[in-house]
Amino acid sequence: MKAGPAISIGQHSEAGRKERNDDSYGVVVPDAALLEAKGIAMAIADGMSSSEAAKIASETCVKTFLEDYYATHPSWTVKTSVGRVLSAINRWLHGQGAANHLSDRGMVTTFSGLVLKSATAYIFHAGDSRIYLLRSGAIEQLTRDHRVRISREREYLSRAVGIDTN
């Protein structure tokens, strides 16, 4: 059996400018059968700190993504599997935010996910959590922040999970 590439996984989280850290992250390296069928899945999410449910939103997003991705049909592509899982998570978070009247921010979180399957890296991203590649001592940002600048002092997220029904 041919050996695959050597992969090292690292995760880092910090609160940043806010006191509270609403980040959640995780990785699943499954057994051999699932590894071949679905690959390795990783995710990081950062709940919108202006929401009282920020940490719940990020934890739910990461946990559900990692569990539900591996429960999708084996014949589905990575894109189909992740698309359906993230769509369901988005609808659920949006619905929970609306049903529970969680201020004006709802249950909203950024999300960056990566699936490594065979020799391909699939990236799924909404918001400003980032995925980087570190190779041969050089670091490269693989995602682009979804932020809109209003002025020098003000900007906002233009995309996030749970922010709307799409």
Describe these PLM feature segments.
Residues 1-166:
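PP2C/PPM-type serine/threonine phosphatase catalytic domain
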